[in-house]
Amino acid sequence: MSFALGQRWISDTESDLGLGTVVAVDDRTVSLLFAASEENRLYAKHDAPVTRVMFNKGDTIESHEGWSLDVEDVIEEGGLLTYIGTRVDTDEANVVLRETLLSHQIRFNKPQDKLFAGQIDRMDRFALRFRALQNQYEQHKSPMRGLCGMRAGLIPHQLFIAHEVGRRYAPRVLLADEVGLGKTIEAGMIIHQQVLSGRAERVLIVVPETLQHQWLVEMMRRFNLHFSIFDEERCVEAYADSENPFDTAQFVLCSLDFIRKSKRRFEQVVEADWDLLVVDEAHHLEWNQTKPSREYQVIEAIAEETPGVLLLTATPEQLGHESHFARLRLLDPDRFYDYDAFVEEERQYQPVADAVTALMSGEKLSNDAKNRITELLSEQDVEPLFRIIESSAAEDEQAQARQELVDNLMDRHGTGRVLFRNTRAAIKGFPQRNLNLMPMPLPSQYATSMRVATMMGGRMTDEARAMKMLYPEEIFQEFEGDSATWWQFDPRVNWLLELLKENRNEKVLIIASRASTALQLEQALREREGIRGTVFHEGMSIIERDKAAAYFAQEEGGAQVLICSEIGSEGRNFQFANQLVMFDLPFNPDLLEQRIGRLDRIGQKRDIEIHVPYLQGTSQELLARWFDEGLNAFGETCPTGRAVYDKFADAIIAILATGKSDGLESLIEESAALNKSLKAQLEQGRDRLLEVHSNGGDKAKEIAEQIAATDGDTNLVNFALNLFDTIGLNQDDKGENAIVVTPAENMLVSSYPGLPYEGCTITFDRETALSREDMNLISWEHPMIQGGIDLVLTEGVGATAVSLLKNKALPAGTLLLELVYVVDAQAPKQSGIARFLPKTPIRIMMDGKGNDLSAQVEFESFNRQLSPVNRHMASKLVNSVQKEIHGLIDKAEISMEERLESVRTDAEKEMKAALNSELERLQALKAVNPNIRDEELTQIETQMSELSGYIGKAQVQLDSLRLIVVSHN
């Protein structure tokens, strides 16, 4: 190592000091001035941790005055370098720049410059970088992108709808699944796919006020999508940043009432540029031909300005035909322009539905059915398929022929592309509900206080009195004060304690109407029997509720009981439990269904035990009997319950207000009869064709199986832990498939993407994540992985490395150079480029003669044979073979030109094949189904020509390289 005054060196250990200049040299020491950081360093001369900075022909360098020079020649004189070349700004030739006058703030951007400047990274980081590029590429190419990372069970019909809709350009659809089938999750999956693919960057979700927090939590917990709730306060705050407050966040959640009430806010929402609008509870938007409601007009105005629209609504039959038409009109006003025409068109689908039902049943087709199918599929020769169905062909061949006919009929189904609707009847796997009605004697304390309350409540309406009589513990407290310990004598509490003791190993969900009742019950269970319980009510923050839910979900050491108030339980699901206690009853059938729906959801593995303790001779008994005998509302889902309740509301309220059973028998009889006839109408109106289409059949199962196969990917686990190590995060094993990850002091960056300041608990196991709300499910799509990969690639982690290969079969000192190139097409994310040409890593492995050995030498197995070299030693090795490395890089560049051409050609071919088949299918469909929107076709044509341009301009650049030297030691 020889030093001369004025030479430029860089520190191996403190590269952020910038470019240093030798200012003093004696026999033993050398002194460097780092002007950029105004620091001096004194090093021992024989072993200074510094690397000489030498540039080569073809490099562009910067002078300390700020102008740049393209280097054409390098002359060394008296130990100092002089660079000669052309000035970039003036094109002046033969400009001379001495190394002493180089810029002090030198930045080495190319990996080879970093290597020669001694900025050599660790070998394990080089491997991590290569794996990050590979995994990023594979994720972008995966057809399941956007569906694997959500924290939700793999339920075929949900995945089918999400896969079908999420890949469309600006989807406009109606999701009308029955209660408990997971519409919110379907919507979340669609949003997630649209966001990941870049098709949607700005999303607006409009929901009823009571559901805002539920949506916020669902989107965050399940999909890692962070929405902001906008209300008047938030809008006022946002004025500092933008004239239109809705422009200050990408993902916005707000209530319909908020936009409806303020003309100004409504106008601002319409003006904000959204890519996707999601409306929950869309059945509340009332419409008729002469006078649509204000709510309907608000959503209509936003939907007109927004390319993608998802409407979540109750089932079409519950809505009534006109109301159902109104939803479809929001999605496509050109197509659904006239109600009478729509009714007529629906009538014409009846034969299609009948034909599909006949095919699906597997029975012999009647001549009538065959004629109908032939007529409907007039442009296709269906005779050969009929022959297969009627022949003695193998069963699966017959099934295939039936399926082909069904698929073709489905494509002609008018609303099949815009409407998805699954019913419990069509989706198997729901548990039984077992009702346990528990009559109990009325305590004298309650009887007295109820009698007095009746005498004193002269001015109360019947409805208020009916509500009051359902909750005797509240009446008792009104007289005795808040400290009244009603739970000491209430027989329901004694019965509950026995139930919990008998079922020590079961999780039990208890729901009471009032938060105060829930809190006092928890106290009673704790004080009287030491039962571990937790409470859940509307007075708690989201975080407090999450903690309570996680404590209840915990298998070991968790709470046996979760006691919820009515409002507190909205939108939370606990399908790991199957014991439900209704400590009291809600006032209407919808709330009852909502209670049972906490456990009776898709994914529930066991039958549900519903326990209803009630006090004899009170309104509780009358209401329990009406729910059970009049509606069978405990035994099965009751889509007709609300309609029956509305019809008999006055009679029900009158009976509950008095607590007398006069007229109850006839009320039950009439309710049951109406319920039966309404259910029969629903059954008749069921659109079986739509159900078949919506649940996706075998295709849906295939999607679920494909995703399940990627769960538990050991490659992901190893990569994630390695990534967290490299960044410098603390990882503590927590057992039960869980790891606690927290930020550390010496991290590579000040804050890590997706990781809260206080850290978080992660798991790689879907089942664990589903039962524990406090855990993050780590997948390739999780922000901690996506953000980590971006961090590694942008921060230049692992861009250079030097390793030793201990192999006596090769001569000592043999050189190998491993280069990783990346092909990149510069294109906007929403163009869809990532599907066909994401950043594509190409590895080249050069031997000393310039032969590419990458096909014979696989990365992982080769990497395991290598050992690391310390930085100082690595720097010496690189300097000794700098010339050879330059030669090998030149050869690699030539070979990359050919590779680039083939990558472009393959991407172009794949893109044309995929988009052409999509286009042809839609064009064929358009001929028979008016639901194909013109803009979908033009969008695909435009996308093809744009993508073709982007792919043709794709460039390649060297991303990272590693020098490998053979050693025998």
Curated annotation (Swiss-Prot):
Record GO biological process: regulation of DNA-templated transcription
Subunit note: Interacts with the RNAP. Has a higher affinity for the core RNAP than for the holoenzyme. Its ATPase activity is stimulated by binding to RNAP.
GO molecular function, one term: ATP binding
Occurrences of domain Helicase ATP-binding (ranges): 164-334
Protein name according to UniProt: RNA polymerase-associated protein RapA
Keyword ATP-binding on entry: yes
The protein's enzyme class: hydrolase
Functional summary from the UniProt entry: Transcription regulator that activates transcription by stimulating RNA polymerase (RNAP) recycling in case of stress conditions such as supercoiled DNA or high salt concentrations. Probably acts by releasing the RNAP, when it is trapped or immobilized on tightly supercoiled DNA. Does not activate transcription on linear DNA. Probably not involved in DNA repair.
Record EC number: 3.6.4.-
Lineage, top ranks: Bacteria, Pseudomonadati, Pseudomonadota, Gammaproteobacteria, Vibrionales
Residues noted as binding ATP in the record, renumbered to the chain: D177, E178, V179, G180, L181, G182, K183, T184
Source organism of this protein record: Aliivibrio fischeri (strain MJ11) (Vibrio fischeri)
InterPro entries linked: Helicase_ATP-bd, Helicase_C-like, Helicase_RapA, P-loop_NTPase, RapA_C, SNF2-like_sf, SNF2/RAD54-like_C, SNF2_N
Protein family per UniProt: Belongs to the SNF2/RAD54 helicase family. RapA subfamily.
